[in-house]
């Protein structure tokens, strides 16, 4: 019988990744023995692997995060190739965030939301309260000045939040979480990118069948042809994968 409160780790190009079998494993791991883990969650996909390779500051930021997990199907396939016995599946960050919010609502876990446009953040708060009765103890949209950061960190600390989700894009959100943890270490932090936009319907996500087939990247490319340059960068990752340089 599998123990869902522990998880193996796998190394890709020097980066330690948690190997979750599925979403339930991820949730049971993060809420092991009824106690929410503390630290930072970072979703890893092929694009982020490339950024880590090219940017020493980002690499240090992400290496310092306790919970790095495979958000991209390419990363999952690379883990399975390097470790043929690995029972690891993709856990999409947007889905994990929703499941965390549902669990937080059920257990009354205090949540602080950071990032996004003011109207999107307001809609996110309203939907979280209506859908799962989430205990939102504070929020801040992404439009604040650098000199306001410290006061925001103090607000988060004073709120007693046990989950802090940050939608600012990478690496801004990783920098924010690292610095905020110096003031408020006793929480689970999660960088969520554009998740608030998807959750509120401002951005359409790929249909489930595309996600299941591992083609969400292709759906986004067809929806946004301007992403072609970003996708072409991934050829470098494919070279690593197919040459076994993992």
UniProtKB/Swiss-Prot annotation:
Q: Which reaction does it catalyse?
A: UDP-N-acetyl-alpha-D-mannosaminouronate + N-acetyl-alpha-D-glucosaminyl-di-trans,octa-cis-undecaprenyl diphosphate = beta-D-ManNAcA-(1->4)-alpha-D-GlcNAc-di-trans,octa-cis-undecaprenyl diphosphate + UDP + H(+)
Q: Could you tell me the EC number(s) of this protein? A: 2.4.1.180
**What pathway annotation does it carry?**
Bacterial outer membrane biogenesis; enterobacterial common antigen biosynthesis
GO annotation, biological process? enterobacterial common antigen biosynthetic process
Look up keyword Glycosyltransferase and say if it applies.
yes
The record's comment on protein family reads: Belongs to the glycosyltransferase 26 family.
This chain's protein is named UDP-N-acetyl-D-mannosaminuronic acid transferase
Q: Which organism is it from?
A: Escherichia fergusonii (strain ATCC 35469 / DSM 13698 / CCUG 18766 / IAM 14443 / JCM 21226 / LMG 7866 / NBRC 102419 / NCTC 12128 / CDC 0568-73)
């Amino acid at each position: 019988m599998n123990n869902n409160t522990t998880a193996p780790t796998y190394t890709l190009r020097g980066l330690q990744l948690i190997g979750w079998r599925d979403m339930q494993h991820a949730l049971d791991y993060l809420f092991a023995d009824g106690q929410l883990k503390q630290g930072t969650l970072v979703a890893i996909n092929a694009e982020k692997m490339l950024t880590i390779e090219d940017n020493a500051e980002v690499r240090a930021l992400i290496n310092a995060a306790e919970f790095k997990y495979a958000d991209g199907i390419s990363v999952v396939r690379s883990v399975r190739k390097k470790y043929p016995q690995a029972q690891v599946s993709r856990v999409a960050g947007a889905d994990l965030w929703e499941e965390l919010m549902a669990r937080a609502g059920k257990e009354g876990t205090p949540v602080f939301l950071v990032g996004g446009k003011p109207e999107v953040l307001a809609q996110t708060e309203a939907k979280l309260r209506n859908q799962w009765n989430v205990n939102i103890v504070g929020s801040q949209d992404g439009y604040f000045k650098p000199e306001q950061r410290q006061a925001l960190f103090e607000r988060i600390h004073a709120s007693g939040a046990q989950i802090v989700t940050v939608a600012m894009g990478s690496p801004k959100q990783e920098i924010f979480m690292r610095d905020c943890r110096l003031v408020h270490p006793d929480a689970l932090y999660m960088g969520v990118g554009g998740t608030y936009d998807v959750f509120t319907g401002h951005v359409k996500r790929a249909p489930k069948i595309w996600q299941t087939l591992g083609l969400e990247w292709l759906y986004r490319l067809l929806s946004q042809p301007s992403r072609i340059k970003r996708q072409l960068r991934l050829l470098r990752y494919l070279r690593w994968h197919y040459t076994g340089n993992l």
